[in-house]
């Protein structure tokens, strides 16, 4: 695979937004882009600040699972948000980002869908993980950090995950410019986020989301920390 330059400048050049990703921080290696964003928040980083790393030494996913991928072939990034809505609405931003990633990947010509609630999948295998974390101060949101990991040009998936995960390269045989994909994700996210804050629900994105839902009318298992349960994915509604 040819190596496409990947740094602050090459990423910034692909981001055509008003605020999402307009400030980019890039590191060859970091503990976690989410933790980095939290540190940037304490330094008064602005809404929409984007932290991108080539490698994470302490990346994590949902339910506290460790998340590590080889450097050079994936996207590892986190965006810092400073919303003024109530904390109870913040968790829905995970779905907003999931939709945004799926829309961006679709724009590359890939047949992509969303496995409820927010797994972005190609050929029914996961290509993306999203972790949303919130910091509070005096009962109000200080920051929301959304971490995104996308398997872009990975040529191999570790053996124990081959039936569950894949990459854009493995599914299409094509290599993709990570700078371009980050720019597409930021553009989609900015538009979707601005829809979300109008109503603090997903009502303005329901049709877009349900159209991309992979497991509609299929059984799903919800891995709640306290009480896992099963059900049928019918799509999303306003709540």
Pin down the residues of each PLM region:
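N-terminal lobe of the biotin/lipoate ligase/transferase fold
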Residues: 1-103, 128, 176
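Long, positively charged amphipathic alpha-helical accessory segments at protein N-termini or as interdomain linkers
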Residues: 1-2, 19, 95-112, 122-239
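Short loop/edge segments at beta-strand edges and connector loops
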Residues: 28, 114-116
């Amino acid at each position: 695979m040819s190596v496409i330059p990947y740094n602050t400048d090459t990423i910034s050049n692909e981001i055509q937004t008003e605020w999402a990703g307009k400030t980019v921080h890039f590191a060859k290696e970091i503990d976690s882009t989410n933790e980095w964003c939290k540190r940037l928040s304490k330094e008064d980083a602005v809404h929409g600040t984007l932290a991108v790393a080539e490698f994470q030494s302490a990346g994590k996913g949902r339910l506290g699972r460790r998340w590590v991928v080889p450097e050079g072939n994936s996207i590892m990034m986190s965006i810092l948000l400073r919303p003024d809505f109530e904390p109870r609405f913040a968790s829905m931003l995970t779905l907003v980002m999931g939709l945004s990633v799926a829309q961006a990947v679709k724009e590359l010509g890939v047949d992509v869908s969303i496995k409820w609630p927010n797994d972005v999948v190609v050929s029914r295998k996961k290509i993306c993980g999203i972790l949303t974390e919130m910091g509070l101060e005096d009962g109000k949101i200080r920051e929301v950090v959304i971490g995104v990991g996308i398997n872009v040009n990975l040529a191999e998936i570790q053996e124990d995950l081959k039936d569950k995960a894949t990459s854009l390269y493995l599914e299409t045989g094509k290599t993709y410019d990570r700078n371009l994909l980050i720019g597409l994700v930021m553009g989609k996210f900015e538009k979707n986020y601005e829809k979300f804050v109008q109503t603090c629900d997903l009502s303005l994105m329901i049709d877009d989301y349900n159209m991309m839902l992979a497991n509609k009318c299929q059984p799903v298992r919800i891995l709640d920390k306290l009480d896992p349960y099963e059900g049928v994915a019918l799509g999303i509604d306003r709540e």
